[in-house]
């Protein structure tokens, strides 16, 4: 493999790591704005499944923190990262399965609505600046849902509709 091929593999590995770091932060409830600034560009846009848009690392982290207080825990599985590179810009398509357990759900394991799952496709654009890849735009197209979806219509604050 030549140097260009090696550089491409390194970039794709770094891009995958950034995308995975975002979902890991959600699962670990690490909503520190400084941490989100290492994942997102200053004007990054995250479009939620309901069409609401969040702009910038601070708004993204604050909105997720507010939204995720409803959950006892969550787990996001991101796989099949397909990455197209064009210089310092990358486009990513990946599959996502997310499971969320409602607060208090551990108190009654027999309840059928103590969790919900959703599966879909994420699309993201990342840009490389000063040797670091960061997400500049991300959206999640939900393809299916299962479980107790009762409270998910309200997904936190947002500044704009997409």
Regions found by a protein language model. Name each.
Residues 91-93, 117-152:
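Short beta-strand edge/turn micro-motifs at domain boundaries
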Residues 18-22, 79, 121-125:
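Short, hydrophobic/aromatic alpha-helical segments in well-folded domains
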Residues 26, 40, 96-98, 139-142:
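Short beta-strand segments enriched in hydrophobic/aromatic residues
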Residues 148-162:
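Extended, polar beta-sheet/loop recognition surfaces of beta-rich domains
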Residues 104-112, 152-153:
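Short, surface-exposed loop/helix-turn segments at secondary-structure junctions
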Residues 74, 115-117:
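Transmembrane beta-barrel outer-membrane domains
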Residues 1-32, 38:
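Short, low-complexity N-terminal intrinsically disordered segments enriched in polar/charged residues
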């Amino acid at each position: 493999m030549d140097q260009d091929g090696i550089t491409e593999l390194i970039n794709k590995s770094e891009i995958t790591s950034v995308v995975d770091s975002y979902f890991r932060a959600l699962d670990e409830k690490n909503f520190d704005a400084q941490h989100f600034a290492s994942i997102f560009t200053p004007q990054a846009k995250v479009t939620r499944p309901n069409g609401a848009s969040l702009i910038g690392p601070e708004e993204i982290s604050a909105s997720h923190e507010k939204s995720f207080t409803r959950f006892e825990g969550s787990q996001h599985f991101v796989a099949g990262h397909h990455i197209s590179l064009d210089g310092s810009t990358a486009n990513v398509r990946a599959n996502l399965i997310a499971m969320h357990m409602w607060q208090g759900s551990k108190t009654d394991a027999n309840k059928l609505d103590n969790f919900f799952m959703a599966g879909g496709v994420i699309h993201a654009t990342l840009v490389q600046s000063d040797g670091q890849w960061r997400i500049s735009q991300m959206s999640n197209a939900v393809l299916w849902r299962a479980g107790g979806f009762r409270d998910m219509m309200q997904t936190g604050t947002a500044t704009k509709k997409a």
